[in-house]
Amino acid sequence: MARRNLADAADGLKRRLREGDVLVKAVLEAEDDPLTLRRQIALKMILNAHSTGVMAAVGRVVGNTMTNVSPTNLKLIGRATYLIMTHVNDTLAQRDWVAAHGFADAVTFAEANAVLFDAMEYVRSHEMGQTAEVALSIIRMLEAFQRRAPASWDDARALLESDGLAGYLARHNPRLAT
């Protein structure tokens, strides 16, 4: 009975596919896997690959990082802080950046974290919904380094809305230009 319901579900899915859609079939044997760990790990890998593809398709990937992290818990705040620090420091170290704007000391984790918390408050107080705090923080920090003066959140937001993070970074970091 369960096998028939699965076949009916697969047929229904095939009827809903549109041109260009891809159906991925994974056969996961349950033999010698009493706790279904292999199946669960395989499913997790498939779902991770799918979500990575979706994030790339909607432009939420910069270089080899998914930058649209919603800092809602300690683990994600740490990841978001690391992404900010990494992208800012990578850009500050580029030869073209140094030639145009001069040398700057690398941003510390604590500095990136402080800017992230300011971004979280800015997004919350301006009811910006899905605005990415990571992208906003990266742009604000780089604009401040470029101007050698503080940059406002509104300026960073305008740049994010007009260029997106990938476009902004591509202009300032040739390694990320595609």
Labelled PLM ranges:
Residues A30-L37, I41, T52-A177:
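Glycine-rich phosphate/diphosphate-binding loops and the adjacent beta-loop-alpha structural elements
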Residues M1-M45, S51-V58:
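Glycine-rich phosphate-binding loops that contact phosphosugars or nucleotide phosphates
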